[in-house]
């Protein structure tokens, strides 16, 4: 009798623990699938549709279903960094040792931290890089501002130094 009570008690404890664990898990604990955009560049003269940026290039949104593991901004940025150029769409988010280091999202502000360097070949690359990064970050309703840093400085400071090399 005592042995069967112990077995019953043990089974009850295990089941209760399992139920508490399952009930306490939030939906956000598991990755969810979502459609995100990342932006590629169509050069001046293209017939593709999108937002016109400096040097009369066009930012073209590319939609993709992805798993959101941390936050949607980071997932979209990962897609942008992984995207390969084609004959009609170019990805200017490339360069020696360039990688996405960290993305935080708090109170409507997305902070994106990059390390490495961009491969900038002319003055038109500056608005291309800015456009691709900021449009990819700001597409989400819970992001009202995007702040991008590269090698511990603002993207604007980094790109203004690069731009000076072409003047």
Where are the model-predicted features located?
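Bimodal "functional hotspot" detector
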Residues: 2-11, 18-167
